[in-house]
Amino acid sequence: MGCLACHHTDRCVIKDDINSIIDKLVESELIVFGVPNYFDNVSGLFKNFMDRLHPLYKSKQLKNKNVIFIYVGGGEENGTKKELHQAINGFCKYLSLDIKKEFSFRALNIDEVNKQKEKIKEILNNIKNMSSI
């Protein structure tokens, strides 16, 4: 919509569930985002979600909030992480989020991520360790 009404209210004026999602993000100690890679960028849906968090830009309610990103794409893991990090870095800069860790999965087919047990274990351990900070 791009109306910028949130600059005056610190809330989105669109009547849907984004304000309750924002409240949950603000209350969280740690935020974990799962981000698919489409054509070396975040998916359109995730980009829409990022844009809907615009009320948090001016209010800085997420300042220094710890964030973990989990990327999934069909290319090499490091390539996916590199490409998505660029888009995510700007998002985090403007919302003053603190990226604590980034993980990347290579997966093209349904259930391919679930077969990567060691990586899942590593991510869960990182989340457990961070949530005790």
Regions found by a protein language model. Give the residues of each.
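A generic structural signal for short
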Residues: 9-10, 76-77, 127
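Alpha-helix boundary/capping residues
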Residues: 7, 53, 127-130
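Active-site donor-binding loop signature of nucleotide-sugar glycosyltransferases
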Residues: 2, 72, 105-107
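Glycine-rich phosphate/pyrophosphate-binding loop and the adjoining helix
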Residues: 20, 89-133
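Short secondary-structure transition/capping segments
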Residues: 1, 45-46, 112-115
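Helix-loop-strand module that forms the ligand-binding subsite of alpha/beta enzymes
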Residues: 13-95
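A short, structure-level motif marking secondary-structure boundaries and short turns
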Residues: 5-7, 72-75, 117
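Local cysteine-cluster metal-coordination motifs and their immediate loop/turn environment
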Residues: 1-13
